[in-house]
From Swiss-Prot:
Organism of origin: Actinobacillus pleuropneumoniae serotype 5b (strain L20)
InterPro entries linked to this entry: Ribosomal_bL27, Ribosomal_bL27_CS
Signal peptide: none
Keywords assigned: Ribonucleoprotein, Ribosomal protein
Single Gene Ontology BP annotation: translation
Gene (name only): rpmA
Upper classification of the organism: Bacteria, Pseudomonadati, Pseudomonadota, Gammaproteobacteria, Pasteurellales
Protein name: Large ribosomal subunit protein bL27
Amino acid sequence: MATKKAGGSTRNGRDSEAKRLGVKRFGGESVLAGSIIVRQRGTKFHAGNNVGMGKDHTLFATADGKVKFEVKGEKNRKYVSIVAE
């Protein structure tokens, strides 16, 4: 005979892996073309001059230079640009 009652099962106990999103290169930092600047879901930051956007909304440098964050436009959108050094 069992000396301990069988434990019930649970439907919890799972969590997804962290996706490591966020800003990877901050304002004023020097970057090379192809460097990832921001990993994001959706367009929290928009691509400015010398910045490209991947299909998962990742922003990356298309030229060498320094990172510049700015708020522009009627809707106060945040833009990331690369300024040539």
